[in-house]
Amino acid sequence: MFKSLYTRIAIYTITVMIFSAVASFLCTNIIYHNYLKENNDAKIMRTLKDSIQYQKESRIEASAPFFKHLGEMNYQVMTISEDGHRTYYGTEFRKDNISKKTAESVLHGKDYHGIKNLPYNPIITGFFENTTKNTVGIAYQSKGHTYAVFMRPDIGKTFSEFRIFLAILITLLLLFSIILVISSTYAIIKPIQQLKRATERLMHGNFDEVIHVTRKDEFGTLQYRFDKMRLSLKQLDDMRQHFVQNVSHEIKTPLTHIHHLLDLLKFAKTDNAREQYIEEIYEVTTQLSELTKALLLLSEIDNGAHLDFDDDIQLNQLIKKIIRHEQFSANEKDLIIMSDLETISMNGNERLLHQAFQNLITNAIKYSTTGGMVDVTLSQNLETITCTITDDGQGMSAETQARIFERFYKSSNHDNSNGLGLAIAKAIFELHHGTITVDSEKNAGTTFTITFKKVPKTIS
């Protein structure tokens, strides 16, 4: 029953209405008991005394017709004679609970203020308590006899038409309130139901249907943010599919090549041919191994919450180490690697930064012309640390520069790389609050600029 938010809000609202009505009744009852009851008692007592005085001044001897007339004027009257006989006029009392002692007290001339002294009852308002105890009383003398006269307003007759009006009013009030509560609840719940359906579509991979903003309140903000989330999920899903396609292609191509080489090896007739095929198979499997390592590293970076960035890194020493390691590759192309490295330290993940800078320096050597030069600089100011890696290779077009950091992007079909090196480097630098930019012109070389924001070291 309460699994639906629509039902829950409607029931809660109606419950609040009922609770408010009960609380209002109790508060009104308390106000009547503490502030209005005494005034009501005095007013009815004054009416009774004025009526008796009028009867005396009018020299009306017969008391029964007079009290009957009071009953017809929407009052309930009870008289008690000296011998205890009780007579009722007007509408019958629900209960006669005036004690004999009280009657005798009134017969002896003491006024009775039953309305003022009626005990508090949280369930029934004293104004509507239709008992002889809830009356005012005085002594009345007629033809040499004394009577105790008790009187209260006949609420039933006095407010008979008003009660019908009030009953209709309350019924319509409740009816319209319930209808409006249900309608307003539906208006509140409708955008939530739309978002619920939208999340179900997202769960099933449907990222194309737009979530429209239909309101300008908090629900509208929620709709807007859900639609932004949908777009982000769509982008991630597109990237995932593209990634899977690229990985499949990068794995399928060398596997096909290996399969072809194995067929050739199977039917090779000379030892030289067999050695050549084995060497080519080794090269292809090495490429596959490098691709696997790169994919594992990407996965580690993408799920980087567990990574530690507390290593105290001597950045200049790290770059020098990479240059020494790659010196053999540079010598094979008669390259000169120039370096101007300031002594700089920073906190981070040394293993990842080593991989990122190695990717950049390896690329610079790979794409530099034979006999050329690679220039590496490292400097800092008060706010940033900057490293530049420049080669004098063939450069790249504006289109290539715009896409160079995309995963699996290759500027040429003849490129035997896996297209992940720069994407990995960029992701690593961003994990270290850094950025990487490229500046290149065709046949004029390429410069990669890495900038880190200085982060104050925390004292543990």
Curated annotation (Swiss-Prot):
Instruction: Provide the top EC class.
Output: transferase
Spell out the post-translational modification annotation for this entry. Answer: Autophosphorylated.
Name the reaction it catalyses.
ATP + protein L-histidine = ADP + protein N-phospho-L-histidine
Give the UniProt subcellular location, in the record's own words. Cell membrane
The Histidine kinase domain covers: 246-456
Annotated InterPro entries:
Bact_Sensor_His_Kinase, HAMP_dom, HATPase_C_sf, His_kinase_dom, HisK_dim/P_dom, HisK_dim/P_sf, Sig_transdc_His_kin-like_C
Membrane topology note: Multi-pass membrane protein
A single GO molecular function term of this UniProt record: phosphorelay sensor kinase activity
Q: Which residues cross the membrane?
A: 11-31, 164-184
Where in the sequence is Phosphohistidine found? 249
Query: In which domain of life is the source organism classified?
Result: Bacteria
Q: Which GO terms describe its cellular component?
A: plasma membrane
Q: What is its main location?
A: membrane
* Heme found in the keyword field: no
Q: Keywords assigned by UniProt? A: ATP-binding, Cell membrane, Kinase, Membrane, Nucleotide-binding, Phosphoprotein, Transferase, Transmembrane, Transmembrane helix, Two-component regulatory system, Virulence
* Entry EC no(s): 2.7.13.3
Tell me the ranges covered by the HAMP domain, including all copies: 186-238
What is the purpose of this protein?
Member of the two-component regulatory system HssS/HssR involved in intracellular heme homeostasis and tempering of staphylococcal virulence. HssS functions as a heme sensor histidine kinase which is autophosphorylated at a histidine residue and transfers its phosphate group to an aspartate residue of HssR. HssR/HssS activates the expression of hrtAB, an efflux pump, in response to extracellular heme, hemin, hemoglobin or blood.
> What is the name of the protein in this document?
Heme sensor protein HssS
